[in-house]
Amino acid sequence: RHGLPPEIHRANTASLPALLLETVAAVKAKNFETIAVVCRTEDEAAEVRSILDITDADSSAFHNGVMVLPVMLTKGLEFDCVILWKPDESRYGNNPREAKLLYVAITRALHELHLMLDADPSSLLL
């Protein structure tokens, strides 16, 4: 991957949505063509769409340059920037299946990778 090292953004649970909005705005200001917020599940993707005020649940469409989708739908895709939502131990545990999903998520980024956390990161990232 070309670009900057991964950036870790930490906040408490109540502040994380605002931090996500700030991060998305900062990334959009860099004029990347493709930005993805990658979540562990479809339910989390729906939560993030709500935070970003994306009302259309069609995860295959870009909305204001940002796509929100669960990790299972990212395989084979690439994005200029990936924002990984809550890659903590409860979502990506230390087992082969979770390791593969996390690997897929973090390797979708061509130029920038941002990790949004309200807990300690998955041990797979350490």
Where are the language model's segments positioned?
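Interdomain hinge/linker at the junction between the two RecA-like core domains of SF2 helicases
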Residues: R1-A11
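Core RecA-like ATPase module of SF1/SF2 helicases and allied nucleic-acid translocases
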Residues: A14-P17, A25-H114, A119, S123-L126
